[in-house]
Amino acid sequence: RAILMDGAKMVNAGRDSNIRRETYKCAPIGGDPPDPLPSPVLNVAQGGLPGFKQENPPDFIGGWTRLRVAGFTRENPDWDGVICISGENLTHWLHISADEVVSSMSFLTLRLRILLEGSDNPNLDAISETLSRPERLASHLRIAQTNQNHRAITGHLIGAELAAARAYWLGRQVAVLGDGGYSAALAAQGVPFTSHDPELCEARGLAALAELLGY
């Protein structure tokens, strides 16, 4: 199956000959008003694939992130659990049940890691330390910064995130799309999880969207 893109728009998907004949068709990704949560994983009632919006607590999930969720659920139908999506700047935790995104929680951890010059490989002791005492995060970060312990910086940030997102991973099945140190962090806490390639999930999401649109 071939995917023809025009910027952020999927022009078509299918055999090359079909794409050449039908390039006028398009499905904007994230271009429409977002769907309020809870919402089906895939919804193209508006002709494209919008993102998600949550009122309380306020959150926004872009259309391309939603596409990755759709790709994961396409390969794991009837999956019930939490997806942790690690991007360049943000981490999203999404509760999935009955082919719906029920709720979400997002964090600036990865952006803070970049600003504070943290390592890609978190220190596991730092994760546990701040997970246990998240109120000491600022102090822990200053100590790690003074010691130039870049792994500890990342560990403390992820530990604080895990403390805040405890309801999303404690006692739940977790799928990690991307990494950013989250696989090691969850493994250290004994959380059952599986790891998945986000780009592969995105490609599968495009295929699922194309099928839903009848391409």
Please place each PLM-identified region on the residue numbering:
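Nucleotide/phosphate-binding catalytic cleft detector across ATP-hydrolyzing
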Residues: R1-I83, L94-Y215
